[in-house]
Swiss-Prot record:
Gene Ontology BP terms: cobalamin biosynthetic process
Name of the featured protein: Nicotinate-nucleotide--dimethylbenzimidazole phosphoribosyltransferase
Gene that this sequence comes from: cobT
Keywords: Cobalamin biosynthesis, Glycosyltransferase, Transferase
Family: Belongs to the CobT family.
Provenance organism: Dehalococcoides mccartyi (strain ATCC BAA-2100 / JCM 16839 / KCTC 5957 / BAV1)
GO MF term (any one): nicotinate-nucleotide-dimethylbenzimidazole phosphoribosyltransferase activity
Top enzyme category: transferase
Length: 352
């Protein structure tokens, strides 16, 4: 807990003075005030995070964390757990969707194994921080110990701290793990208080029969383990996943370093919900990249008071939505840096 506690102690609110200056600059640019809508709000929030009316967005990374889940033993999933490590290898060598979209936005990919079940060969492009070979089946007991949950969070903090040392203005979250919509739905239901019918989606394409099995399994896990909604680490340990804990740590660590976090889809959203429950202040540092088709994603975003930048009917994960949203965030910041003012352009201002 030492690293987690030290990280939490460094998190404080947005720089209001920088935000006022950023908005004042927006207001003298050659456009009606407020006419760029959310683009203006994005850059003002960035200014508050970085403490600079003209923030930076050049140095970007997407951290994709992987973990397997014991609940796949319940036999309602379409993909074998071996796919997790196979996709990790694709991430590491540039062939996956996240690699393509990261190249588009100029973000470096950071690939982390945190709870992968299948043994894998050493790879210089994969950071192997495996805590365990996947979670336990939460239908029969806690997914992990409390100590393992804290460790997952602290690994996430360590990973983002290392990226900050390399130079980091924006960090995106991404996930990989067969079965990870089930713990995400459990986390969402427990913390928001919404029913499993409301928050549980089809994941990678569950049939109606598989959906019944999925909801029943998650309901059993919640009933048996009885997680405390006010104790995010308890929730994570009982019905969570290692990659979810790791991404929660990335979010907390980024906030402690005054780095904006672009939160991807449902699994990243569950991680954000864990981080938010631990430290509500982290909301100020988060941008919701997109709204996934997973129904629980909209619910957890509403719970945290976050509005998604994009709505693209996506449900892949990996950090793909975060990469896309970085384009919008960077565009907002270019307006702040490059657009002419009324005085610069010789354009008459609105008459009062």
């Amino acid at each position: 807990m030492e690293l987690l506690n030290a990280t939490l102690a460094k998190i404080y609110g947005l720089d209001k003075e920088a935000m006022v200056k950023a908005q004042a600059h927006q207001d003298i640019l050659i456009k009606p005030q407020g006419s760029l809508g959310k683009l203006e709000a994005i850059v003002v929030q960035l200014a508050g995070i970085q403490g600079d009316a003209k923030p930076k967005t050049a140095k970007k990374a997407i951290i994709t964390m992987a973990g397997d889940h014991g609940i796949i033993d319940e036999k309602f999933h379409n993909w074998p757990k071996e796919v997790t490590v196979q996709m990790l290898q694709n991430f590491a060598h540039g062939g996956a969707a996240i690699n393509v979209l990261s190249r588009q936005v100029g973000a470096r990919n950071v690939v982390v194994a945190l709870g992968v079940a299948t043994p894998m060969a050493a790879d210089p492009n994969i950071i192997n921080r495996n805590i365990a070979p996947g979670t336990n089946n939460m239908v029969h007991g806690p997914a992990m110990t409390r100590e393992q949950a804290v460790k997952a969070i602290e690994v996430g903090i360590e990973i983002v701290n290392a990226e900050v040392k390399k130079g980091l203005d924006l960090v995106g979250t991404g996930d990989m793990g067969i079965g990870n919509t089930s713990p995400s739905a459990a986390i969402c239901s427990v913390i928001t208080g919404r029913s499993l019918e409301d928050v549980t989606g089809r994941g990678t394409g569950a049939s109606d029969e598989q959906m019944k099995l999925k909801r029943n399994a998650i309901a059993k896990a919640i009933s048996l383990n009885n997680p405390d909604a006010k104790d995010a680490i308890d929730v994570l340990s009982k019905v969570g996943g290692y990659e979810i804990g790791g991404l929660a740590g990335v979010i907390l660590g980024a906030a402690a370093n005054r780095v904006a976090v672009v939160v991807d889809g449902f699994i990243s959203g569950a991680a954000a919900l864990i981080a938010y429950t631990i430290c509500p202040q982290v909301k100020d540092f988060m941008f919701a990249a997109h709204q996934s088709v997973e129904p629980g994603h909209r619910i957890l975003l509403e719970h945290m008071g976050l509005d998604a930048i994009l709505k693209m009917d996506m449900r892949l994960g990996e950090g793909t939505g975060a990469a896309l949203a970085m384009n919008i965030i960077e565009a907002a910041n270019r307006i702040q840096h490059e657009m002419a003012s009324f005085a610069d352009a010789g354009v008459s201002e609105k008459q009062s």
